[in-house]
Swiss-Prot record:
Stored HAMAP family: UPF0473 (MF_01448)
Protein name: UPF0473 protein GK2553
Classification lineage: Bacteria, Bacillati, Bacillota, Bacilli, Bacillales
Native source organism of the sequence: Geobacillus kaustophilus (strain HTA426)
Similarity comment text for this entry: Belongs to the UPF0473 family.
Pfam families named in the record: DUF1292
InterPro entries: UPF0473 (IPR009711)
Matching NCBIfam families: PRK13678.1-4, PRK13678.2-4
Taxonomy, superkingdom: Bacteria
Amino acid sequence: MEHGDRHITVVDEHGNEQLCEILFTFESDDFGKSYVFYYPVGVEAEDENGETEVHVSAFIPGDENKEGELLPIETEEEWDMIEEVWNTFCAEQEEEDDE
């Protein structure tokens, strides 16, 4: 994972690179990890309902000379916590849109 201000380059298992925009990041004290929500840039990522597919991964930030690393979500407890964060984010976005 290459980490820019608002973009990352994700490399899949086949070595293909995909530029993605970072939606937001957060840290979990409970799991001792950082997480990133992101989605592909410049591709038809919307489904038939006009919704964009958003991905989430744990990540280790890189330093000045090293790329960061995306990690898989490992447990159901992690997924439950991530779902809560996502639902809170979506609710806040809806409130902002209503204003």
